[in-house]
């Protein structure tokens, strides 16, 4: 595993790197990187970070899950912290890159254990919509995020499920199929930010085509660059006429 920083590493090379880690160490649970098509769902997020947040900034991967986004942040040269209610296998690799990790307690579901005005950015990758499932709520979580952000710091929320997503609607009808209990629209996003004093900078829908379904296909299909490019282009085209039915929102807000 390379420990070079992303300053000299294009996003495509980073994706290849983390896919190789998943292939070599499958117990790390980096399931999103079992196929090139599914791995590409994060390219837009990587670009947002590189465009909005300067190198060496302090960034929190809030609800870091299996640690895949923390790995990107570290490779990109950010001072990276992670927070989760559970530890994860991949952390032993992240620790080689000066990673700070704090574990939360389920009896304090709303608390983020960092001091006021600590971070230049806090990122949620598919986390904010789950806080009610662990005894919290969106407003209290956003108030905590506001507290730990530096003045002018950014909250970047990615993979925030769209209320009218066709994928979510179908998934909810299939027994034992994963879907999100809580989904949102633009008005709800603005309301959440207004109630927590966060200034909305950008809101957009994305992701009309499914991605994770590719993970269990043969390697010759799921990791084919031509197929991946066709899928990416199709997804980009379809998001315009079918934006309302896209799977997710992303929004960027500032303290």
Model-derived regions, located:
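Conserved short-loop catalytic and cofactor-binding motifs
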Residues: 33-34, 110, 129, 133, ...
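Conserved N-terminal segment of class I S-adenosyl-L-methionine
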Residues: 1-115, 121-125, 142, 246-249
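A short SAM/SAH-binding and catalytic strip from SAM-dependent methyltransferases
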Residues: 121-136
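S-adenosyl-L-methionine-dependent methyltransferase catalytic module, highlighting the catalytic core
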Residues: 103, 132-144, 154-254
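Short, solvent-exposed loop/turn segments at secondary-structure junctions
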Residues: 65-69, 86-88, 128-129, 162-164, ...
